[in-house]
């Protein structure tokens, strides 16, 4: 059986026609799934009994089961552990803002990138998620909170560009007016910096925001923090970013997790200013999430602000990320790992 969420409307139409069914039934089915959030074919009232049986025999609506749901004390952040049909568990985080609800979705079960500050990668990668499985996190979360989600961040477990085909199909699906109709400008894709895939993504000409996990302007330190830096130097990464900016005319966000005594010095801030000077970019400074498997400590607020001020003085737009959901392990990979380790 196949997950119907992996299908575009046109693909489902073609399948129905091949079974001597009416093509317009595909639109009716999509309406039930994406607008009414009905995930059982038998509850789709305007679908004939014969067609329901045909669909049930060949497809399932692959929305995951909620195995854990946590809500922060301020009620603005929800953390979900979702379980797929094969028993694999991933996590998603919903953040409520005045401008709308945002979800951070996972693209893989685990991750193989090995970034030292990330809990998602500690057990390696188990498998890629399909386009429909990524999409299903949004649908399951919408059903749980009873509200529409209008912004998507691909920044949960997994490296999106390490699952390129499924992630790009997800982008095509989620932005389609036949499914969730989320605007491309409301989507952010975060990557540790797989250079050839950044260029390939640029050639797709999406209007999404690309976020690069940078974390150091120096190759030696970046190699220590992020194994991907052993393959691609900062020079190569910046060349790929320039290609992306020139191709899409979209501003890039550089994520920079500040670790006390490691990458939060004035010297590092000045070097970062030099690396990014003149680029169409924005820097998001992040107090690092402390995990027991490493000795990384959060930089002090004073250091973070001083670091940011140097960037601003050099004409680089900079913000400090607001921490949300710290009381519910909302950082990437923390909740899933504590759950599966039991």
From Swiss-Prot:
S-adenosyl-L-methionine binds at residues 158-159, 190, 213-215, 289. Gene3D superfamilies: 1.10.150.530, Aldolase class I (3.20.20.70). The active site is at 91 (proton acceptor), 332 (s-methylcysteine intermediate). The keyword tRNA processing applies. It is found in: Cytoplasm. Its main location: cytoplasm. It is an enzyme of class 2 (transferase). Keywords: 4Fe-4S, Cytoplasm, Disulfide bond, Iron, Iron-sulfur, Metal-binding, Methyltransferase, rRNA processing, S-adenosyl-L-methionine, Transferase, tRNA processing. It catalyses: adenosine(2503) in 23S rRNA + 2 reduced [2Fe-2S]-[ferredoxin] + 2 S-adenosyl-L-methionine = 2-methyladenosine(2503) in 23S rRNA + 5'-deoxyadenosine + L-methionine + 2 oxidized [2Fe-2S]-[ferredoxin] + S-adenosyl-L-homocysteine; adenosine(37) in tRNA + 2 reduced [2Fe-2S]-[ferredoxin] + 2 S-adenosyl-L-methionine = 2-methyladenosine(37) in tRNA + 5'-deoxyadenosine + L-methionine + 2 oxidized [2Fe-2S]-[ferredoxin] + S-adenosyl-L-homocysteine. Residues 97-327 form the Radical SAM core domain. [4Fe-4S] cluster binds at residues 111, 115, 118. Specifically methylates position 2 of adenine 2503 in 23S rRNA and position 2 of adenine 37 in tRNAs. Reaction proceeds by a ping-pong mechanism involving intermediate methylation of a conserved cysteine residue. This is Probable dual-specificity RNA methyltransferase RlmN. It comes from Clostridium botulinum (strain Hall / ATCC 3502 / NCTC 13319 / Type A). The gene is rlmN.
